[in-house]
């Protein structure tokens, strides 16, 4: 058979990109969401997924009923997720760094220490906090939360008894135990609503949240419209 040369493969890739650019240009004019019939994939972990995307879906149903929203886990987002079109948008506190990757900050959260008040007193001092056993979220491959790495860099060493792959795994371990979880405060509005929380007795940085997309979608009218809808949801949900 005929084997494509590297030059031919490069030309084919350029042709695909050109066709994509022409298609996006055709969509960059007037856009009617009511006529949008497509699947839009957003990569988000359970914190931002549960906080934002149900409200986004409810909003989309009003004006873009033909749109299917597909949600996949972002874990630690990679450039390939966006460059390879595995998703059209990422929502994450860790935007991948690339010249062809764009981002916009959606909101900023702060950290609180969650615990079961039936099992322990609040950790009000640094000594209480460091003496306790902790639970945290670790994304594969063993990528700790930015907070955990920040505290370790400050010489604040905690004893981790449990590590789970997502925020949804925290409540079953915290309930009925003396474990502490230092996680985003807005989890208190849904996932951790039945637990108590206090301000961390150690210095914690803020946690920004971004929406991230590939530059190929910057002038796409449909993509731009959906980004605007997400920002509107943030304005309603994040107060």
What are these regions (language model features)?
Residues 2-34:
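Alpha-helical "hinge/linker" immediately C-terminal to small N-terminal DNA-binding modules
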Residues 35-96, 164:
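Central regulatory/effector-binding core of bacterial HTH transcription factors
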Residues 50-52, 121, 126, 197-238:
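A late-sequence structural motif
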Residues 75-78, 83-87, 93, 140-198:
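Hydrophobic hinge/microswitch elements
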Residues 33-34, 98-134, 223-224:
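Flexible hinge/capping segments at coil-to-helix
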Residues 13, 17, 55-59, 76-111, ...:
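Short beta-strand-centered segments that line the small-molecule binding cleft or hinge
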Residues 98-105, 109, 168-218:
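Beta-alpha-beta core module
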Residues 93, 120-126, 132-154, 219-223, ...:
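Secondary-structure junction motif
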